[in-house]
A protein has these predicted regions:
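Hydrophobic alpha-helical transmembrane segments
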Residues: 1-136
Length: 136
């Protein structure tokens, strides 16, 4: 059961938010290989590279929860699934709209994708901070 206290430590929410921002930068950019980035956008054969990319996100989220609240490490799987769904929907929308990086529509989709990932991380950061906040 996830128990959110009435008040969450400001320090914990700041630290958890920063941790998820760093995790996202690492997993979505630095640790994403060319195979993942190009492969997840293909009309066929997209599942293995997308699963690998989303798996990196999930593993890093699980690691954050393992450090603070091990019973909540399963949220890594939830993050991986959500991340994969968001990325796949963006890919399908880009293909349907036939947009490229030279068009504004591509960047609108990229912005929506990143915003949804950050919204996911906001929720996860709240849960991580709640788990780390000492009981009153």
């Amino acid at each position: 059961m996830i128990d959110i206290p009435d008040q969450i430590s400001t320090l914990w929410i700041a630290a958890a938010s920063a941790a998820f921002l760093a995790k996202h930068f690492l997993a979505d950019f630095l640790f994403q290989t060319d195979w993942m980035a190009a492969g997840k956008e293909k009309p066929r054969g997209w599942l293995p590279p997308l699963a690998a990319h989303a798996g990196v996100h999930g593993a890093m989220t699980a690691a954050l929860f393992l450090a603070v609240a091990p019973p909540l490490a399963w949220l890594g799987l939830a993050d991986a699934i959500l991340h994969g769904l968001i990325d796949r929907l963006k890919s399908l929308a880009a293909r349907r709209m036939r947009v490229t990086p030279r068009q504004a529509g591509f960047w609108w989709l990229f912005g929506a994708d990143q915003s949804l990932h950050h919204l996911t991380h906001l929720g996860l950061a709240i849960l991580l901070a709640a788990a780390g906040t000492p009981a009153a």
